[in-house]
Swiss-Prot record:
GO terms for biological process: negative regulation of interleukin-1 beta production. Disulfide bonds: none annotated. Signal peptide: none annotated. The gene is Serpinb1c. This is Leukocyte elastase inhibitor C. It is found in: Cytoplasm. It comes from Mus musculus (Mouse). GO terms for cellular component: cytoplasm; extracellular space. One of its GO terms (molecular function) is peptidase inhibitor activity.
Length: 375
């Protein structure tokens, strides 16, 4: 795992914990790489303690040449000709009365293929909101219809960071629609719901992490560059979703263990699901140490505008994920510790809450990280 992927994946887990704390029994889906990339773009224009807080929270201090590494990563995961579609769409929207430095605008365009759009928050914030939503809609093939709800921006807004991700991948081995049936899914020890359960028998990377008491299954996408990795607890052992212990103990090392799976015959039962989650990340990032960025008196974004009176009003991220028989649409290693298995086909029945991530295998980056409590 390279410096940047370690930094990004560690940040992904820390952000995942804060998102789950604020919504302990709900679904979660976000794109950590997309958020890291967007914040790196802000970091490029940050100075002083604002830059130091971003660097520490994003673990940039452990990696060199951050911006050129992000440039390479973006090119790698979004390259044309791949059998999947992945678009990281980041854009800053700034109040038009501010002067933004031409060299900063040129840098974010060159390094992050991003730009800064000037809008009239001061006199026409509702028009600005609609313009932002229209742009996001276009970037995500209309999957994300309304990133900014009414009231998210107003006449006091100075600068917002918009972050949208669109991904579409097809399974290497598709589920057959005729095998999909109604089946129970346990939301907790006492509550169940009926879901559309897909079925597939195939030879797939599988393992077991004893510390977490969970099975791990890797489902490759066409081309092999991306995989969905599912972490399924043996059972619901707590009084909520059954995920409490896994979430507490999920570390960078445990993520790396998920790279050491063994191919075996598996009977997979996986629910079809569709999720859409939106986050204003200010408070979550504040919990992780990014505070000055959102303060009108403390923020130092003088590398963006040349002045000290600019700060970020909102950082908004929205992800959409749909898993079906064909594949996924989203918007948004320690040898020996994963135990392989047996000669009979392994049953992998996803009939209770689980975690998943979508990994870019060549770089080991976690592109999406999610929790499904109710498919």
């Amino acid at each position: 795992m390279g410096q940047l992927s370690s930094a990004n994946n560690l940040f992904a887990l820390e952000l995942f914990h804060t998102l789950n704390e604020s919504n302990p029994t709900g679904n979660t889906i976000f794109s950590p790489v997309s958020i890291s990339s967007a914040l790196a773009m802000v970091y490029l224009g940050a100075r002083g303690s604002t830059a130091a807080q971003l660097s520490k929270t994003l673990h940039f201090d452990s990696a060199e040449d951050i911006h050129s590494q992000f440039q390479s990563l973006t090119a790698e995961v979004s390259k044309r000709g791949a059998s999947h579609t992945l678009k990281l769409a980041n854009r800053l929207y700034g109040e038009k009365t501010y002067n933004f430095l031409p060299e900063y605008l040129a840098s974010i365009q060159k390094t992050y293929s991003a730009d800064l759009a000037l809008v009239d928050f001061q006199h026409a914030s509702e028009d600005a909101r609609k313009e932002i939503n229209q742009w996001v809609k276009g970037q995500t093939e209309e999957k994300i219809q309304e990133l900014f709800a009414v009231g998210v921006v107003d006449s006091m807004t100075k600068l917002v960071l918009v972050n949208a991700t669109y991904f579409k991948g097809m399974w290497q081995k598709k589920f057959m629609a005729r095998d999909t049936t109604d089946a129970p899914f346990r939301l907790s020890k006492k509550v169940t719901k009926t879901v559309k359960m897909m079925y597939l028998k195939n030879n797939l990377p599988f393992g077991y992490i004893p510390d977490l008491k969970c099975k791990v299954l890797e489902m490759p996408y066409q081309g092999g560059e991306l995989s969905m990795v599912i972490l399924l607890p043996e059972d619901i052992e707590d009084e909520t979703t059954g995920l409490e212990e896994i979430e507490k103990q999920l570390t960078l090392e445990k993520l790396q263990e998920c790279e050491n799976l063994q191919n075996i015959d598996v009977c997979v039962k996986l629910p079809k699901f569709k999720m859409e989650e939106s986050y204003i990340l200010n408070s979550n990032l504040g919990q992780l140490g990014v505070q000055d960025l959102f303060s009108s008196s403390k923020a130092d974004l003088s590398g963006m505008s040349g002045s000290r009176d600019l700060f970020i009003s909102k950082i908004v991220h929205k992800s959409y994920v749909e898993v079906n028989e064909e594949g996924t649409e989203t918007d948004a290693a320690m040898p020996g510790t994963v135990v392989g298995c047996c000669l009979m086909p392994m049953e992998f029945t996803v009939d209770h809450p689980f975690l998943f991530f979508i990994r870019h295998n060549p770089t080991a980056h976690v592109l999406f990280l999610g929790r499904v409590c109710s498919p």
